[in-house]
């Protein structure tokens, strides 16, 4: 063995083994009006069937249906790597005759996950915190309109500072290639005009692989992704492909010339899953946490009457109360006690070190 070799080069292997053993968690939200192929696309993306037991309401029932939040989980294993996927669905979004404030349950749900994580993170037992925060939201846009509708804009404005948004055009096989490009540009212009932040692809380092740089640029340019989903396998010539057959031909789900399905799956799974989680924690969650601390620091914010007033305000205007007052004071006392014990322990260690040093100096003199 080389005498100059210490062994730090093996550190990535340690991290790899630890990550593989622990597995990965990822929470994905899908939102958008009914009939845009959300369920089919999710099943196509992850090669699973998350909607076996779903009952689809008829058209008359949809007009009175209110938005609900459904959470489904599945463990996917591939090549020894386990991913615990949690899918958050929003059936009923935009289906009611009156869609006023229909996005508020989604906003509350996202903030509740932040609040729960904050509680767990502030507790004494922080070893096994379950991360239920929403890491990404696929927002489906209709291919039949002329861009974003007022409801789309209102929803995206309400959540764009709370979750990574990936806009997708559902059922893109309804459009010609030229129509797809026009609609994409229209949506990009509207997002910029309305100052709506969507997920920003990180800039590649100069030493990144050239193939990865090329893929990253291609994914950036394809936003919003025009997608088609299908669980059906059809034959195109002699090849079995997943796609949809029409009288005029076959749309192949995994053909990059037909739609952006491959780019979307590559981004979500192969290249940017970890970055989506890091942005959620470092930027979106920290922003929520800062707003909570600011709301507690305001004069009178800890007064019960004031807290009651704040809780009645729209979830889009102010963060949810972080903790009940009694719980907050208890947590502060526990933290103070923990800090006091740590300070005492540190002082004892310093005293012991000084005593040992003094004894060592005395023995040297002798």
Swiss-Prot record:
Region listing for G4 motif, in residue ranges: 170-173
Any one cellular-component term (Gene Ontology): septin ring
Family: Belongs to the TRAFAC class TrmE-Era-EngA-EngB-Septin-like GTPase superfamily. Septin GTPase family.
InterPro entries: G_SEPTIN_dom, P-loop_NTPase, Septin
Keywords: Cell cycle, Cell division, Cytoplasm, Cytoskeleton, GTP-binding, Nucleotide-binding, Phosphoprotein
Chain positions with Phosphoserine modification: 206, 247, 306, 314
Keyword Acetylation tagged: no
Stretches for region G3 motif: 89-92
Domain of life: Eukaryota
Gene3D superfamilies reported for this sequence: P-loop containing nucleotide triphosphate hydrolases (3.40.50.300)
Pfam families hit by this protein: Septin (PF00735)
Protein name in the entry: Septin-1
GO biological process, one term: cytoskeleton-dependent cytokinesis
């Amino acid at each position: 063995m080389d005498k100059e070799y210490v062994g730090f080069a093996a550190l990535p292997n340690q991290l790899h083994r630890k990550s593989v053993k622990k597995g990965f968690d990822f929470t994905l939200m899908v939102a958008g009006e009914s009939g845009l192929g959300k369920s089919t696309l999710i099943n196509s993306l992850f090669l699973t069937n998350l909607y076996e037991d779903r009952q689809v309401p008829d058209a008359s029932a949809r007009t009175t249906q209110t938005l609900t939040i459904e959470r489904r989980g599945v463990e996917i294993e591939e090549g020894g790597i386990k991913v615990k996927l949690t899918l958050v669905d929003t059936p009923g979004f935009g289906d009611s005759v009156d869609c006023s404030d229909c996005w508020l349950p989604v906003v509350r749900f996202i903030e509740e996950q932040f609040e729960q994580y904050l509680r767990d993170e502030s507790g004494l037992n922080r070893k096994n915190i379950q991360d239920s925060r929403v890491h990404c939201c696929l927002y489906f846009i209709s291919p039949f309109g002329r861009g974003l509708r007022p409801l789309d804009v209102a929803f995206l404005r309400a959540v764009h500072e709370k979750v990574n948004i990936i806009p997708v055009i559902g059922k893109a096989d309804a459009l010609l290639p030229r129509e797809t490009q026009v609609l994409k540009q229209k949506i990009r212009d509207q997002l910029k005009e309305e100052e709506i932040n969507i997920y920003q692809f990180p800039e590649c380092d100069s030493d990144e692989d050239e193939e990865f740089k090329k893929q990253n640029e291609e994914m950036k340019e394809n936003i919003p992704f025009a997608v088609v989903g299908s669980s059906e396998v059809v034959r195109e010539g002699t090849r079995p492909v997943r796609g949809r057959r029409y009288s005029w031909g076959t749309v192949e789900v995994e053909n990059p010339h037909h739609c952006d399905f491959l780019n979307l799956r590559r981004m979500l799974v192969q290249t940017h899953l970890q970055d989506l989680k890091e942005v959620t924690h470092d930027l979106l969650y920290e922003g929520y946490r800062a707003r909570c601390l600011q709301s507690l620091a305001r004069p009178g914010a800890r007064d019960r009457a004031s807290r009651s007033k704040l809780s009645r305000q729209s979830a889009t205007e102010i963060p949810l109360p972080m903790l009940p007052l009694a719980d907050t004071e208890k947590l502060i006392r526990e933290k103070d006690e923990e800090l006091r014990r740590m300070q005492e322990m540190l002082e004892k260690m310093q005293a012991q070190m000084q005593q040992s040093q003094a004894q060592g100096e005395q023995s040297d003199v002798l």
